[in-house]
From Swiss-Prot:
Protein role: Catalyzes the formation of pyridoxal 5'-phosphate from ribose 5-phosphate (RBP), glyceraldehyde 3-phosphate (G3P) and ammonia. The ammonia is provided by the PdxT subunit. Can also use ribulose 5-phosphate and dihydroxyacetone phosphate as substrates, resulting from enzyme-catalyzed isomerization of RBP and G3P, respectively.
Active-site residues annotated for this sequence: 84
Pfam families named in the record: SOR_SNZ
Highest taxon above the source species: Bacteria
Protein name per its UniProtKB record: Pyridoxal 5'-phosphate synthase subunit PdxS
Entry binding sites for D-glyceraldehyde 3-phosphate: 168
Record note on quaternary structure: In the presence of PdxT, forms a dodecamer of heterodimers.
Organism listed in the record: Corynebacterium efficiens (strain DSM 44549 / YS-314 / AJ 12310 / JCM 11189 / NBRC 100395)
EC category name: lyase
Length: 297
């Protein structure tokens, strides 16, 4: 599928990101998985060489995927293909744009390349998605040009608790702004370490200026539906599908649950007979230094 023409205009990039609302974006490591994801109803796939669970288990430095691998997935499906670049690694982003990916994830799942600076996303035609654990972090990424935000969660664990915490935090901070007087927003902007203009926008609109999706630890249809009920615009699923016992059926079930997140009968029906979910890791058992969501600022 050919890449979108965005002309580096923030509004156009955000408009392109709107197409993913209400949908599921799935991590895939080869063309076969990409085709499974497309057949299951995924709105996009994330091409990477190792899913987060394997990155976590194998350790070492994790970088952008091989261009040949990304090309194979681009050729295999007709839905948009995303790919990850390291935080701050603008040359990896340049390469991904050259390859024709439709979205770049400046991702904490990969080993950060720069501990002081994120990528200047306005310098690219391709839109970016970035992770956030709170509203200030989300607005700083938007100020750098991100066209989509995802609450981080804790990737590769199968434990949805951090995804819940981050989504609730962002939503609560948004709600707090909506009740503030205009003069209080100056103080809020300082506290959030975010531009005043973006803080005012959130206060007036009651939402981010870009779509807010969720990620990290989503492993079941019920997980996906819960995150949608908590206010997510869509769902990223990483290890939860292809580290499970029946990836094809689980992928379809998570898509159905995301689309019908307020329908317990549908969620119950699609949750039957899925086989074993990924084994997972309790986030509380992870040392702070091993928590991927801590990356970024």
């Amino acid at each position: 599928m050919s890449a979108p023409t965005t002309n580096a205009a923030p509004r156009a990039k955000t408009g392109y990101a709107d197409r993913f609302k209400g949908g599921v974006i799935m991590d895939v490591v080869n063309p076969e998985q990409a085709r499974i994801a497309e057949a299951a109803g995924a709105v996009a796939v994330m091409a990477l060489e190792r899913v987060p669970a394997d990155i976590r288990a194998q350790g070492g430095v994790s970088r952008m995927s091989d261009p040949d691998m990304i090309d194979g997935i681009l050729e295999a499906v007709d839905i948009p293909v995303m790919a990850k670049a390291r935080i701050g690694h603008f040359v990896e982003a340049q390469v991904l744009q050259s390859l024709g990916v439709h979205f770049i994830d400046e991702s904490e799942v990969l080993t950060p390349a720069d501990y002081a600076n994120h990528i200047d996303k306005f310098a690219f035609e391709v839109p970016f998605v970035c992770g956030a654990t709170n509203l200030g972090e989300a607005l700083r990424r938007v100020n750098e040009g991100a066209a989509m935000i995802r609450s981080k969660g804790e990737a590769g664990t199968g434990d949805v608790s951090n995804a819940v915490t981050h989504m609730r935090t962002i939503r609560a901070e948004i709600n707090r702004l909506t009740s503030m007087a205009e003069d209080e927003l100056y103080v809020a902007a300082k506290e959030l370490q975010a531009p005043y203009e973006l803080v005012v926008h959130v206060a007036r609109e009651g939402k981010l200026p870009v779509p807010l999706l969720t990620a990290g630890g989503i492993a079941t249809p019920a997980d996906a539906a819960m995150m949608m009920q908590l206010g997510a615009d869509g769902v990223f699923v990483g290890s939860g599908i292809f580290k499970s016992g029946n990836p094809e059926q689980r992928a379809r079930a998570i898509v159905a649950a995301t689309q019908n997140y307020n329908d317990p009968d549908t969620i119950a029906r699609v949750s039957r007979g899925l086989g074993e979910a990924m084994v997972g890791i309790n986030v509380d058992d992870l040392p702070v230094s091993h928590r991927l969501a801590e990356r970024g600022w």
